Regions:
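Cysteine protease catalytic domains with a Cys-His-Asp triad
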Residues: 1-105, 109-115
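Cysteine protease-like catalytic core of ubiquitin/ubiquitin-like
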Residues: 66-212
């Protein structure tokens, strides 16, 4: 008997029971859950929306390990230069070829503003990682290789395990805001209430997709 069965097979993402269990309690969210949610945004919530790009943790790790001159290998197939807003799930893992790390944050590129915004629920924790990746990506995304980097104020977590949940809440807020306002600046904050409800919200999404045969 498989003790860790596949719960959901959604496009390019497989969720096992151990992944889904992370949503049921006070647990740190792993790469698989965040990748699933980013894919859900792309394939369901914002299906057909060409102005938004959601880049999964696995691809972000590859970008961190790749020379600026070679980023096109990963980003050209995603049409990154044609997107107005690019969302990257950033981890502080220093081992470039495997999953890991202890903290998630969100890096967002706003093409209309030529600016990277970093949203960190433990402000300063992933600053070094975000600034380094920003400098590399600007050489690819902006023909002039120039742009700004802003460590944005954001709602702060009060525990050691909700950073991934905060990333997903930030994505929800910013994706909607950016489409309505054509910018990231002035976006405001997510709320503690929204953060508290996010795990159950994702579980509901998973059950809904299961009912559709995924």
């Amino acid at each position: 008997m498989n003790k860790n069965p596949v719960i959901l097979n959604f496009n390019d993402t497989l969720l096992h029971q151990s992944d889904v269990d992370l949503l049921n309690g006070p647990h740190w969210l792993n790469d698989n859950i965040i990748t699933f949610y980013f894919e859900y945004l792309e394939k369901v919530a914002y299906l057909g929306e060409k102005n938004l790009l959601f880049i999964s943790p696995e691809v972000v790790q590859c970008l961190k390990a790749t020379k600026a001159s070679e980023l096109s290998v990963f980003l050209d197939p995603l049409a990154a230069k044609q997107r107005k807003f690019v969302f990257l799930a950033l981890n502080n893992c220093e081992i470039m070829d495997k999953a890991g790390g202890s903290h998630w944050s969100l890096l967002v590129y706003s093409q209309p503003e030529e600016t990277f915004y970093h949203f960190d629920s433990l402000k300063g924790t992933n600053y070094k990682q975000a600034a380094k990746l920003c400098g590399k990506l600007l050489k690819y995304l902006n023909p002039n290789g120039t742009g700004d980097f802003i460590e944005n104020d954001a709602l702060q977590q009060n525990n050691s395990y909700d950073c991934g949940v905060f990333v997903l809440c930030h994505v929800d807020l910013l994706a909607n805001y950016s489409l309505q306002n054509n910018r990231i600046s002035g976006c405001g904050w997510t709320t503690q209430e929204y953060v508290k409800s996010k795990r159950s919200s994702i579980l509901h999404i998973i059950k809904n997709l299961q009912s559709k045969g995924y």
